[in-house]
Design a protein with these regions (language model features):
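Extracytoplasmic/lumenal domain signature
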Residues: 1-29, 33-175
Length: 175
């Protein structure tokens, strides 16, 4: 259907929309990325590579652990974190890797092989903070692949990235 759409042809999409059902308790809230390999979906429990042509084909799935949402306490001057359960971020892609965070304590950056889904690396990020500092990764990691074997990433802490007084008159979302 996509080739026909790109060629400007009229297309009946009723046979081109497919559904992949997740397990009970599993949800995909904001973790979606696409490449020529397929769609990478990050749920609160797993990372998937799906392809769709005449139905949905699961190429691989990789489980990971997460602690879910993180909340501010009453009286805090900043908002909390955890806009979504699970990794909290959308997957970042290179030609060979899918990278995402797990929102554990400390937060880990996980890299899985794009072709197989096998976890090839995991390391703590944003872990050299004072005791009790909350961390919530809510944006995709910035990824740079130099094409010669070095992949660099930047992961940001978004916990408290907005004003808790947003609902009050004369306030905005800045800290």
């Amino acid at each position: 259907a996509i080739d026909k759409i790109l060629n400007g042809e009229d297309v009946d999409l009723s046979d081109a929309v497919f559904v992949y059902e997740l397990e009970p308790g599993e949800g995909a809230e904001n973790g979606i990325a696409a490449s020529k390999e397929g769609a990478v979906i990050l749920t609160n429990l797993k990372c998937y590579l799906l392809q769709a042509d005449n139905g949905v084909k699961k190429v691989w799935e990789t489980s990971y652990k997460s602690v879910g949402a993180k909340e501010s306490k009453e009286g805090d001057e900043t908002t909390g974190g955890g806009l979504a359960w699970g990794g909290g971020c959308s997957p970042s892609l290179t030609k060979d890797l899918v990278m995402f965070t797990d929102n554990q304590d400390p937060v880990n950056l996980i890299a899985v092989d794009m072709k197989t889904g096998e976890q090839v690396a995991s390391m703590p990020v944003i872990d050299e903070l004072p005791e009790g500092t909350q961390v919530s990764v809510e944006n995709s990691a910035i990824v740079y692949d130099d094409g010669e074997g070095t992949v660099s990433t930047i992961v940001c802490n978004w916990f408290g990235a907005g004003s808790a007084k947003l609902g009050e008159a004369d306030n905005d979302s800045s800290i």
